[in-house]
Amino acid sequence: MDQDPEGVSVESALADVLACPACGSPFEPAWSQELLCRDNSHRFPVADGILHLAVESSSADWKVAEPAQTSEAYARQYQALEEAGRYNAMYERRASKRATTRKEFRLIRRHIRAQPPCETILDLPCGGGRLSGAIAEAAPEALILEADIGLGQVQYAREHGLPGRRQMFMTASGFHIPVRDQGVDAVVCCRLFHHLPTVAEQQRLLSELIRVARRFVIMTFFDYYSVKNTLRRIRAPFNHKPPKITMKPDWLRETAAGLGAELVSMPHLFYLFSGHRYALLRKSG
């Protein structure tokens, strides 16, 4: 089993962090090729340094009235390493994407550095590790849990890991995060909410992020009232483009408050040219 740069085994580093995504119980303390949950004997494989903890579900499983034909197709993307490689190469190749990444780095670093130092940070979805460097720069001593529903993305992130940094890798669903309540100091969740078409999915993800975070959550959303989305809505009757998947800041503020978190700030990625905002939610109490 892998060790982090400080010589601590995966089992030791994650003993008080992980929980079974199927039932929430802790895992048995010793594992090498699989994880076994203590209460219900659910088994999850460990292969090539990656913990396979993703479980599939939809809003039908959460006993809500909303239909469940939602983000399933998106969740199936990037299961293969080759697909993930093409996606990440696009961000490295295009000048506009590189500029966006630089701005995202600044926003992530600003949010993390504004909070007390972290020991554990969950990066979900980590993708191919595009934004992992920003987290590591802002929290150099933290153990970063790199998680994504796409196995190919996690494989790519592991192959392109950050030398000398403490990283662990796993597949995971944002709807069933395999982490104990308040199991990590913080969660970074970038570029996911705008892929979830229904309120049920958005609320489920938000509740999971706040559940597992002890101190704060950084998350992005596409603002319904942004300049970019306003122009899109104005043009829609003429160009017939479908509406963006958006979120209203008041909904985020009120929903987060009901889950025990305060919306502290939400700077724009680019005020005129992007609808994305980087929200910082701080846990109450």
Question: Which sequence ranges carry the predicted segments?
Answer:
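Short alpha-helix
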Residues: 243-260
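Conserved beta-strand signature within the Rossmann-like core of class I S-adenosyl-L-methionine
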Residues: 214-222
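Conserved class I S-adenosyl-L-methionine
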Residues: 48, 54-115
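N-terminal auxiliary segments of SAM/dcSAM-dependent transferases
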Residues: 2-73
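A conserved beta-strand element that flanks and buttresses the S-adenosyl-L-methionine
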Residues: 188
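A short glycine-rich, Lys/Arg-flanked "PGG" loop and its adjoining helix->strand segment in the class I
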Residues: 203-215
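Class I SAM-dependent methyltransferase SAM/SAH-binding core
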Residues: 122, 128-176
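Short, glycine-/aromatic-enriched active-site segment of Class I SAM-dependent methyltransferases
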Residues: 222-242
